Amino acid sequence: MEKPRSIEETPSSEPMEEEEDDDLELFGGYDSFRSYNSSVGSESSSYLEESSEAENEDREAGELPTSPLHLLSPGTPRSLDGSGSEPAVCEMCGIVGTREAFFSKTKRFCSVSCSRSYSSNSKKASILARLQGKPPTKKAKVLHKAAWSAKIGAFLHSQGTGQLADGTPTGQDALVLGFDWGKFLKDHSYKAAPVSCFKHVPLYDQWEDVMKGMKVEVLNSDAVLPSRVYWIASVIQTAGYRVLLRYEGFENDASHDFWCNLGTVDVHPIGWCAINSKILVPPRTIHAKFTDWKGYLMKRLVGSRTLPVDFHIKMVESMKYPFRQGMRLEVVDKSQVSRTRMAVVDTVIGGRLRLLYEDGDSDDDFWCHMWSPLIHPVGWSRRVGHGIKMSERRSDMAHHPTFRKIYCDAVPYLFKKVRAVYTEGGWFEEGMKLEAIDPLNLGNICVATVCKVLLDGYLMICVDGGPSTDGLDWFCYHASSHAIFPATFCQKNDIELTPPKGYEAQTFNWENYLEKTKSKAAPSRLFNMDCPNHGFKVGMKLEAVDLMEPRLICVATVKRVVHRLLSIHFDGWDSEYDQWVDCESPDIYPVGWCELTGYQLQPPVAAEPATPLKAKEATKKKKKQFGKKRKRIPPTKTRPLRQGSKKPLLEDDPQGARKISSEPVPGEIIAVRVKEEHLDVASPDKASSPELPVSVENIKQETDD
């Protein structure tokens, strides 16, 4: 992505391909970027300079993948993991799989459907060429679904409404059901973690170019005209993907400042309106403030910075993900963390995967990021010696749409690679002691033991003094994981260590414990203790996954920073539910990420409606729920009515559970799960609360126990 350019700069121009124009017309608002030039008043220019005409034709034909799969082109021989299997790319849809799993003798397509679609498109292209008097070509104009699906998804996330199969709202439904980050940050003077701190999010490596004082063209919401008009605004403050803007002309008057997500389609570089014949109209409030607006703007714009011309194009490109619905993989069994299970990708949102267990119910799902260490390619468990549950395909799952669309196994290089390890000169041994984040209670760092050494650097770890004696609570960590630490790590960094049962935290001593258990500590040199300059600071706000209920992403705060280790506090919840995560964890996101991707964000407090909402009943199989109930922080003021969905118990715990709590009411299924809180005096007032676009019958009501 280009750096923010000065208004005086004029980049080189070249013709725009017609195919790419058509490609972008899929988006509501993105089509306005055609023939774009970064200089004001220029007549014709291009916003893409990296592709030749021949490359674009090949890409349209499906021969040059435009997604992260560009590392592999169709027919390129390449071994996956030493097994001799060759990967292949479907020439119709772009799905990556193994050649032996592909259809036909040529192995060009993943399924009969893709083969027929390719043939049909080839015929259509040939007929069209003859009608236009063009010479015939062997290349078929086919859809490259790997690229199109990402663009369609981005469009639906920003424009659409609806829910996933598990009841999770998406698109505009998710945004309205969320809360106002801008008001929350401004009212309390909070600071958000910069986008550049999160390596797994779109444009993280270019976001430092978005700076205070930058000029943009945005939709003018203070105008009474029949058509959409725009005006120039300055960036006053940045908070993750969101920026605080002020229309030009208000100068030091902050009364009309407004927040906007830079990922939306109504924010453009300076000059976009001139190129696309859009009208610049000053806000009605200050329309009479100046008589010569043109002269005023020229003085304000000379020498200023603006967004790169390809900003939205790069944003869309960075939101393409290699995982597709129907891919099979291995994932940790949430009911027994010492083993894995086969699962199928059901949904992909912003790189987060909703997985369905092959041998489970249709609602037996698991959420994680595609870079999560909890997922692995098919065959991983057998290769490293990890336990796996042998699944038997359920007959009633054959009718589930995801299982009917299984393409192939996800190839190994789609998963995040782990650091290579060398076992010469001493390695981890069974019985060695260390400190590790408890996978069943992520707010605790416990005394732990290496129970088994697997291949490829993986270790089976158990927490000393755990309730299980048969290895059911063992958990797999890689030797390079930042969730395991050498003995005395907590003591050196003033972190409370959770000792084994029968020991007191205040009096626990590692030397005495090792002598009593006749064991030895794992050498410090075996641990990965490097610490990057991550940029996180105490008090920064972000959006974090509740790993005890990984479907939920919540408003959170960085409570403590210990080298690369972050203590995440969920706003509005007691400190006992804090979680330790690594600074490069894919389970934390910048402010505005949920809005950008269309994922629902759980607010720190629940909205309080004027009337009770009708409970929604569902007739599904009752499931046990595990874990502790969350206690709300006592409010400063009692209220006669409390409304909202409770935080669910540990039903989707990615690492299983250790204690069984009370069961839910039979036949009761939570449709929309948000944390329930009392509204405090600092919560948004009733007038500023967004109106729900969905019927109140679709929201579940619960009462306190």
Curated annotation (Swiss-Prot):
Q: Which GO terms describe its cellular component?
A: nucleoplasm; nucleus
Q: Which residues carry this modification: Phosphoserine?
A: S13, S67, S338, S683, S688, S689
Q: Where in the cell is it found?
A: Nucleus
Q: Where is this region: Disordered?
A: 1-84, 608-665, 680-705
What is the protein's major site of localization? nucleus
For this UniProt record, the keywords arranged alphabetically read as follows: Chromatin regulator, Isopeptide bond, Metal-binding, Nucleus, Phosphoprotein, Repeat, Transcription, Transcription regulation, Ubl conjugation, Zinc, Zinc-finger
Which intervals hold the zinc fingers (FCS-type)?
81-116
Bias class Basic residues marks the residues at 619-634
GO molecular function per UniProt: chromatin binding; histone binding; histone H4K20me1 reader activity; histone H4K20me2 reader activity; methylated histone binding; promoter-specific chromatin binding; zinc ion binding
Q: Name one Pfam family in it.
A: zf-FCS_1
The Gene Ontology biological process annotation of the record reads: ectoderm development; negative regulation of DNA-templated transcription; negative regulation of gene expression; stem cell differentiation; stem cell proliferation
Q: Does the keyword Ion transport apply?
A: no
- Describe the protein's quaternary organization and the partners it interacts with: Part of the E2F6.com-1 complex in G0 phase composed of E2F6, MGA, MAX, TFDP1, CBX3, BAT8, EUHMTASE1, RING1, RNF2, MBLR, BAT8 and YAF2.
From the Swiss-Prot or TrEMBL record, give the protein name. Lethal(3)malignant brain tumor-like protein 2
Q: What gene name is listed for this protein?
A: L3MBTL2
